[in-house]
Amino acid sequence: MAKAGVLTTSDYLPIEAFERLLEGLHRDKKYVWELFCSIAFATALRVSDVRSTRWMDVLGKDDFFKKEKKTKKTRHISLDTTVRDRISELYVIMGSPDKNQPVICNKKTEASFTTQYINRTLKKFRVKYQLPIKAFSTHTFRKTFGRYIYDSAQDKTEALVLLNRIFNHTSIETTMVYIGLRQDDMDKAYRSIKFKSYDEAISV
C-alpha cells in the first residue's frame, strides 16, 4: 500500500485497451477477473475496498456506500445501468454465489484474493493480452477511471476538480500526474494555441 502523499508507480490503460482486456477475459472464461476489473474501474475503489466488497453490496443496486479502508471516509457510489447489468450477468455465469461472499474470492476457501496474488495475475494478463502498459497493477483501474473521465469531459478544468474530490488528493497537480497528464500532454495543450499570420489576417 502506498504511503499518504506518495503516488503509485502504476500506469493507466487507454480505454480501448481496457475494453479489449474485458473482452479477452470474458472470451477466456476468466469471469472473476472480468468482474474484478469491471468493478475496480467503475467504482474507482482501491484494491483493499474492492476485496472487501460483497455481492450483497452491489448486486442489483443503483448505488451503495463504502467505507474506505485507507481514509476511513464513507463514499457514496452510483452505478450505471450497464454496470449493474454486467455485475448481474457475471453473478449468474459464476453460479450465483452466496451473496455474503466477497465478489473477488477463491471458490474453495471463499476468502478474498490477496493484493499480491491479484498483482501477479495482472502482470500475466499484461503479456497475454498484449496491453500497452509498463506498470500494470491493481491501481491501474483507478487511474484508468480518472483518465477516462478527463478525456471524456468537455470542460477539462471541471473534470480535474471533480477527480480531485473523488481521489481526495491534496492538489490539482497531484491529480494531473496521477492520471498521466505529464509534461508532454501539457506541452501539446500549449502548442495547440495558434495565431494567424499578419498576411492571413489581412487577407481575411
Where in this protein do the model-derived segments appear?
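Short basic/aromatic active-site micro-motif
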Residues: V32, I133-S152
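Basic, Lys/Arg- and aromatic-enriched nucleic-acid-binding interface segment
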Residues: A2, I15-A42, D155
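C-terminal secondary-structure termini that scaffold catalytic or DNA-interacting sites
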Residues: M1-Y12, K194-V204
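Active-site-proximal segment of tyrosine recombinases
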Residues: D49-R51, G146, Q154-N168
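Catalytic-site neighborhood detector that most strongly recognizes the C-terminal catalytic loop/helix
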Residues: E68-K72, F167-S192
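DNA/chromatin major-groove-contacting recognition/catalytic segments
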Residues: T82, K156, G180-V204
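Active-site/catalytic core of tyrosine-dependent DNA strand-transfer enzymes
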Residues: F18, T82-I133
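Conserved tyrosine-mediated DNA breakage-rejoining catalytic core shared by Y-recombinases
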Residues: S52-D85
